[in-house]
Amino acid sequence: MCVRATDKANKIFGNMVYFFDDGPALQQRTAAKLVNGEHEEPYFNVYYEHKYVYGDFNHDGLKDAAVIITENTGGNSDWYTLAFLINDGMKLVHKASFILDDRAIINSLREKNGKVFIDMYVHNPDDSRGGPTKRVKNLYQYVDPDKLPGHKITVLFDRTQL
């Protein structure tokens, strides 16, 4: 990608609102407005990781995006999350997220036939929290909640190489 396109994308994705569920029992969503890639408050920090891909993820003919963000709620975990930003005809809006892993190492993020392909390292059960060693190559599909209630992202395959 050219530098100008990357700078423009980083400005957009680093200065928008992302939503997080406060838990199924509360049925609430917390909004985090990023400024220059960061949202910081006590016990709730969100960062844009400068990893993104464009595609038509809801198949409406408009350019959507998928980005990697991290969330930290005050503990030792930095939850790497895939966020789908869907074009509503005027702007990109965060519609769905999928937690990838605590401190995942993202090797690559690509668009493939309207889906997101991620090559990354995640934690094996016996890994220390500092260093994931399990390599996975997953394909993620955005699912419009109006078409399939309760589902927003589907993992289509999980290719694991130990």
Model-derived segments and spans:
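Acidic, small-residue rich beta-repeat scaffolds with periodic aromatic anchors
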Residues: 1-26, 105-162
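Blade-edge motifs of beta-propeller repeat domains
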Residues: 1-46, 93-101
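Short consensus segments that form the blades of beta-propeller domains
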Residues: 42-43, 72-77, 126-132
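N-terminal post-signal-peptidase region of extra-cytosolic proteins
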Residues: 47-52, 67-68
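Acidic, divalent-cation-chelating loop motifs in proteins
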Residues: 52-60
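Short, surface-exposed coil-to-beta transition loops
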Residues: 63-66, 77-81, 102-105, 132-137
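Extracellular C-terminal loop/segment signatures of secreted glycoproteins
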Residues: 80-100, 151
